């Protein structure tokens, strides 16, 4: 069993597991932190960004200053943002049989995999994962395509040039794998390969293994996966949460008795309490709008935004914010808000029960009905007419490199009355803000990450007790910025096995058993013989038939009778010849009794010699030797087949036949 690690980002995993002749890809996350090296894509022409000075090497490379721009001491690539793809050279991705998706954040690289690697398999995901994943991809494509940029930068990627660039460009990894965004045509083609599954549904893969999705408690439709054969079990835990938010709670019991547990997608902010962050978010939001400022919340169109809107629903009246407009701008805003209300079966029990009252599971439906929350596809059209300040605005993208958020950063960034509140943990807020410096608006960092922290992981591992734990190397050591915090790493026995990007891990357990079925008529023919009190044995002579990784013992074909006809058989009528099977023998030969038997049958001049492994019986008159050992008996005589058969029959009297 081998694990191929194709991604270096622990919360955006992409691994390939080879198990029992099947090749299974576990997630295909897309590392978007690479976009932080690029200049933002403004919806409206930005004189500030257009007039940034070019950056070039000291040798005065004239072409480089067209690709690189400098802003407040940072250097950025002036080109369409590119994304860091999973490894495509470590393993032939056309050999991947299936892709298992754990949540909608971990499928953003799917079109790159399914459309450009020769992949012909099936993708398995829950319905909310597929539908919300579609929304995230559609939003991403829309953000990139609506701001066409003619310039494409590639000179800076040359290894000899890159090493001379300032950080973080100098330290950017795998820049040769960075690619532009896919198209909607590729998105639709990739999604057409998805087969929808439900929690606890068992899916057979080629008769070799069975895969089962379990609720992971993190997002709508998010899953952990069990991959098991009859005698081995692998658990894949990715993006899980024990907190009570809107999804179904995490299924922990099904993870027990795992031979290997692959652990990814832990919280990116292990020292931040999500509840505390939500409280800080609300208080900073209220403080800003009371002072006449606007609040900008960069976010994804699904996930944490549902919980934030629910908290604000309970908070706005008590905080005196009833008259403050809330705006949600995204090309998929309407679809996202509607989807959250119709996936009732994937919600926690409290929200499920509201559906039957009937009430909407999420309170943002009421916020929309009362006009406290308005949603728009973009800043153009209706939004321009309805827009009033001060306001609270939710929009994408959290990287601040594309989307409507770029426009509002340019619009509001010069006033200290305004505040930007970061709630998504995927991007460094300091790096996200770098191309907008100098910035007057206030910045609040309230990362809300409900995924498992290290304390919860330690408790989980003690409860489910896997034989082996496998995880990214980042989880086996404290974070670089907090090297003294030994509690911010996985602590388990035996120690976790770690992996890094482009590494192949041989997992430390070997298959020992295989399940074989036996045909009823063959079972009927077995005659067990008691060899010890309470222990019976029966020999099985059969044909092993294997198809689709299922093994069946069938009765052997009867020996074919020779026919005088010389007529040729058709190929498909050929049956393998079956020789008459010799019985298996067991037992031991008592030498003294055997010698007496030989004498009774006319043999004389018998001599017995002891050897290291047994005895040798010499028949001197017949010039024959019988070698008796613990696990074999040999009759050695000189070209006298009649004598050999007589002696064989006498030996067989002392042995049991099966």
UniProtKB/Swiss-Prot annotation:
Positions bearing the Glycyl lysine isopeptide (Lys-Gly) (interchain with G-Cter in SUMO2) cross-link: 58
Task: Tell me one Pfam family matched here.
Answer: IntS9_C
Subcellular locations according to the entry? Nucleus; Cytoplasm
Q: Does the keyword Acyltransferase apply?
A: no
- Domain of life, per UniProt, equals Eukaryota
Q: Where is this region: Disordered?
A: 548-572
Key word Ubl conjugation present: yes
In chain numbering, motif Nuclear localization signal lies across 566-570
What does the record's miscellaneous section state? Although strongly related to RNA-specific endonuclease proteins, it lacks the HXHXDH motif that binds zinc and participates in the catalytic center. Its function as endonuclease is therefore unsure.
Assigned protein family: Belongs to the metallo-beta-lactamase superfamily. RNA-metabolizing metallo-beta-lactamase-like family. INTS9 subfamily.
Biological function: Component of the integrator complex, a multiprotein complex that terminates RNA polymerase II (Pol II) transcription in the promoter-proximal region of genes.
Protein known as: Integrator complex subunit 9
Instruction: Give the source species.
Output: Mus musculus
Lineage of the source organism?
Answer: Eukaryota, Metazoa, Chordata, Craniata, Vertebrata
Per the record, the gene is: Ints9
């Amino acid at each position: 069993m081998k694990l191929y690690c194709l991604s270096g980002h622990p919360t955006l995993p992409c691994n390939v597991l080879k198990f029992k002749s099947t090749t299974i890809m576990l997630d295909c996350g897309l590392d978007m932190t690479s976009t932080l090296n690029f200049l933002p894509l403004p919806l409206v022409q930005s004189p500030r960004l257009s007039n940034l000075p070019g950056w070039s090497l000291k040798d005065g490379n004239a072409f480089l200053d067209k690709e690189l721009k400098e802003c407040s001491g940072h250097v950025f690539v002036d080109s369409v943002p590119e994304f860091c793809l999973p490894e495509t050279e470590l393993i032939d991705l056309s050999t991947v049989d299936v892709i298992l998706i754990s949540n909608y954040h971990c499928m953003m690289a799917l079109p790159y995999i399914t459309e450009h690697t020769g992949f012909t398999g099936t993708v398995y995901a829950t319905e909310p994962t597929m539908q919300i994943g579609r929304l995230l991809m559609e939003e991403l494509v829309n953000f990139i395509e609506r701001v066409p940029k003619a310039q494409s930068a590639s000179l800076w990627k040359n290894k000899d040039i890159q090493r001379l660039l300032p950080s973080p460009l100098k330290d950017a990894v795998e820049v040769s794998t960075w690619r532009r965004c896919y198209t909607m045509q590729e998105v639709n083609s990739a999604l057409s390969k998805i087969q929808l599954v439900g929690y606890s549904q068992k899916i057979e893969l080629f008769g070799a293994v069975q895969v089962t999705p379990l609720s992971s408690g993190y997002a709508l439709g998010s899953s952990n996966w069990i991959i098991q054969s009859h005698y081995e079990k692998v658990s894949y835990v990715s993006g899980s949460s024990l907190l009570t938010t809107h999804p179904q709670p995490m299924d922990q019991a099904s993870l027990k008795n795992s031979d290997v547990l692959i652990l990814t997608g832990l919280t990116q902010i292990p020292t931040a309490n999500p509840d505390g962050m939500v409280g800080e978010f609300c208080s900073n939001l209220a403080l800003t709008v009371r002072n006449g400022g606007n609040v900008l919340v960069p976010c994804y169109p699904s996930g944490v935004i549902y919980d934030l809107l629910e908290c604000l629903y309970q908070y706005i009246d008590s905080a005196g914010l009833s008259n403050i407009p809330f705006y949600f701008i995204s090309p998929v805003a309407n679809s996202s808000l509607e989807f959250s209300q119709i996936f009732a079966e994937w919600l926690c029990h409290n929200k499920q029960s509201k559906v039957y009252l009937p009430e909407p599971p999420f309170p943002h439906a009421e916020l929309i009905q009362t006009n406290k929350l308005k949603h728009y596809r973009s800043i153009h059209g209706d939004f321009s007419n309805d827009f009033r300040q001060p306001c609270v605005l939710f929009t994408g993208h959290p990287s601040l490199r594309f989307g409507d958020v770029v426009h509002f950063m340019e619009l509001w960034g010069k006033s200290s009355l305004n505040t930007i509140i970061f709630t998504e943990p995927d991007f460094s807020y300091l790096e996200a803000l770098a191309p907008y410096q100098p910035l007057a608006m206030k910045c609040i960092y309230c990362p809300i990450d409900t995924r498992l922290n290290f304390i919860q992981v330690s408790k989980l591992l003690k409860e489910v007790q896997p034989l082996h734990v496998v995880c990214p190397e980042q989880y086996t050591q404290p974070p670089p910025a907090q090297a003294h915090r030994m509690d911010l790493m996985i602590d388990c026995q035996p120690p976790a096995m770690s992996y890094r990007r482009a590494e192949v891990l041989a997992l430390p357990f070997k298959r020992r058993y295989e399940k074989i079925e036996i045909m009823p008529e063959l079972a009927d023919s077995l005659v067990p013989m008691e060899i010890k009190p309470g222990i019976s044995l029966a020999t099985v002579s059969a044909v092993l038939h294997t198809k689709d990784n299922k093994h069946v013992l069938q009765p052997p074909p009867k020996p074919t009778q020779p026919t005088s006809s010389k007529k040729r058989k058709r190929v498909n009528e050929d049956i393998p010849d079956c020789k008459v099977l010799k019985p298996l023998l067991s037992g031991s030969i008592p030498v003294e009794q055997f010698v007496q038997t030989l004498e009774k049958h006319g043999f004389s001049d018998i001599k017995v010699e002891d050897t290291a492994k047994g005895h040798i019986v010499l028949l001197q008159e017949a010039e024959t030797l019988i070698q008796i050992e613990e696990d074999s008996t040999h009759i050695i005589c000189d070209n006298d087949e009649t004598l050999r058969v007589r002696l064989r029959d006498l030996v067989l009297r002392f042995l049991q036949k099966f």
